[in-house]
Amino acid sequence: MLSVAARSGPFAPVLSATSRGVAGALRPLVQATVPATPEQPVLDLKRPFLSRESLSGQAVRRPLVASVGLNVPASVCYSHTDIKVPDFSEYRRLEVLDSTKSSRESSEARKGFSYLVTGVTTVGVAYAAKNAVTQFVSSMSASADVLALAKIEIKLSDIPEGKNMAFKWRGKPLFVRHRTQKEIEQEAAVELSQLRDPQHDLDRVKKPEWVILIGVCTHLGCVPIANAGDFGGYYCPCHGSHYDASGRIRLGPAPLNLEVPTYEFTSDDMVIVG
């Protein structure tokens, strides 16, 4: 085949391109060698990575646009003329608009104005809070109909001399006693040293002939019986407490005298309790 390709003349390249070789039985005398690949470069581990040469690529190579330091004033880059630098002059006071002047000269006036605004605000808030608290507390107070029942008018001409009448006042029994002249003199002559809860008769009445008491025993809250007991005043049937005609404890376990409510004589024939 090779000889035919060599004799073909101008067709030799075509014939040689389409030819193929057939392996013979003879072994080659020289072994074929494979070309060696180039070796990879070995890094020098002894060379420090953070060196001037290794960091030179990260260094700034252009002019600085801003710098800040202890002795270096801050600078602004005006490379873009369409960017407006923030100006807070509208929010600053007139005394501190000039940056070349010291603010200590106007500090007293500025502090005084701040204190004035704070004080006025505090007073306003306190006044509003006072009104709110007053309305809240008044909403929990008794209504007008309840306050009307808090006072009771008693016509004294309906109570004969030497008698005791009971009324209901604020859910409690109220005793109104029309004393005789003998009872008045008897209670006024009692020595205070004989009393467990010392109190003179004149200190418990506004008019000697009228005694107004709350009919609740000071021991355990029972209702005493009028015109009874060893002293002719009131007697508690629960535990045997004896009161005189002035409502003072004279005998028994009760520790205190009968309570005297607040009352006022509006006329000779009318008294208002409460």
Swiss-Prot record:
Pfam families to which the protein is assigned, alphabetical: Rieske, Ubiq-Cytc-red_N, UCR_TM
Principal location class: mitochondrion
Domain called Rieske: residue spans: 187-272
Cofactor note: Binds 1 [2Fe-2S] cluster per subunit. Fe-S cluster delivery to the Rieske protein is mediated by components of the iron sulfur (Fe-S) cluster assembly machinery that reside in the mitochondrial matrix (including HSC20 and LYRM7).
UniProt topological domain (Mitochondrial intermembrane) ranges: 141-274
Catalytically driven reaction(s): a quinol + 2 Fe(III)-[cytochrome c](out) = a quinone + 2 Fe(II)-[cytochrome c](out) + 2 H(+)(out)
Post-translational modifications reported in the UniProt record: Proteolytic processing is necessary for the correct insertion of UQCRFS1 in the complex III dimer. Several fragments are generated during UQCRFS1 insertion, most probably due to the endogenous matrix-processing peptidase (MPP) activity of the 2 core protein subunits UQCRC1/QCR1 and UQCRC2/QCR2, which are homologous to the 2 mitochondrial-processing peptidase (MPP) subunits beta-MPP and alpha-MPP respectively. The action of the protease is also necessary for the clearance of the UQCRFS1 fragments.
Membrane topology field: Single-pass membrane protein
BP term (GO), one: mitochondrial electron transport, ubiquinol to cytochrome c
CDD domains in UniProt: Rieske_cytochrome_bc1
Entry's localization field: Mitochondrion inner membrane
Annotated positions binding [2Fe-2S] cluster: 217, 219, 236, 239, 241
An example molecular function term from Gene Ontology annotations: 2 iron, 2 sulfur cluster binding
Residues exposed to the Mitochondrial matrix side: 79-103
GO cellular component: mitochondrial inner membrane; respiratory chain complex III
Transmembrane segments: 104-140
Cystine crosslinks: 222-238
Residues annotated as signal peptide: none
EC main group: translocase
InterPro entries (alphabetical): bc1_Rieske_TM_sf, Globular_prot_asu/bsu, Rieske_2Fe-2S, Rieske_2Fe-2S_sf, Rieske_Fe-S_prot, Rieske_Fe-S_prot_C, Rieske_TM, Ubiquinol_cyt_c_Rdtase_Fe-S-su
Classification via SUPFAM superfamilies: ISP domain, ISP transmembrane anchor, Non-globular alpha+beta subunits of globular proteins
Keyword terms, alphabetized: 2Fe-2S, Disulfide bond, Electron transport, Iron, Iron-sulfur, Membrane, Metal-binding, Mitochondrion, Mitochondrion inner membrane, Respiratory chain, Transit peptide, Translocase, Transmembrane, Transmembrane helix, Transport
Note: The Rieske protein is a high potential 2Fe-2S protein.
Family: Belongs to the Rieske iron-sulfur protein family.
Name under which the protein is recorded: Cytochrome b-c1 complex subunit Rieske, mitochondrial
